[in-house]
Curated annotation (Swiss-Prot):
Recorded family membership: Belongs to the globin family.
GO biological process: hydrogen peroxide catabolic process
Globin domain mapped to chain residues: 3-148
Task performed by this protein: Involved in oxygen transport from gills to the various peripheral tissues.
GO MF annotations, alphabetized: haptoglobin binding; heme binding; metal ion binding; organic acid binding; oxygen binding; oxygen carrier activity; peroxidase activity
The name this protein goes by in its record: Hemoglobin subunit beta
Signal sequence, renumbered to the chain: none
Keywords: Heme, Iron, Metal-binding, Oxygen transport, Transport
Tissues expressing the protein: Red blood cells.
Originating species: Pagrus major (Red sea bream)
Annotated positions binding heme b: H64, H93
């Protein structure tokens, strides 16, 4: 189980409250699919994702990005039990979708980049980023739980 300091809890919840999930989710998933094109194979049902422009304009990509942010919200609300909160999601991604668990880490990086760009260094300072990265590492670990 992860130990959170009061400062980390506060940083994560405060940052989460400033994130526009309808904006950051689609941006992060779009970035993932463009920067790491091999991840596109999991989204073949989304229609045309053959070019960067197609990915940027694809509403199914945007919709799934918002869905993923809903999953992150679940983690924020369950900081003390993220692993169990993600059990079914981990099973789905490992047993049904067969997502390479390293893709979760790549998406977490994309989230951090998008949040940092959007909120800037005064909000997303080193202390906040440290707590956020720890949070995302726990989420990534929980999503990969069924792979071990």
């Amino acid at each position: 189980m992860v130990e959170w300091t009061d400062a980390e809890r506060s940083a994560i919840k405060t940052l989460w409250g400033k994130i526009n999930v309808a904006e950051i989710g689609p941006q992060a998933l779009t970035r993932l699919m463009i920067v790491y094109p091999w991840t596109q194979r999991h989204f073949s049902s989304f229609g045309n994702i053959s070019t960067n422009a197609a990915i940027l304009g694809n509403e199914k990509v945007a919709e799934h990005g918002r869905t993923v942010m809903g999953g992150l919200d679940r983690a924020v609300q369950n900081l003390d039990d993220i692993k169990n909160a993600y059990t079914l999601l981990s099973q789905k991604h490992s047993e049904i979708i067969h997502v390479d668990p390293d893709n979760f880490r790549l998406l977490a990086e994309c989230f951090s980049i998008c949040v940092g760009i959007k909120l800037g260094p005064k909000v997303f300072n080193a202390n906040v980023q440290e707590a956020w990265q720890k949070f995302l590492a726990v989420v990534v670990n929980a999503l990969g739980r069924q792979y071990h």
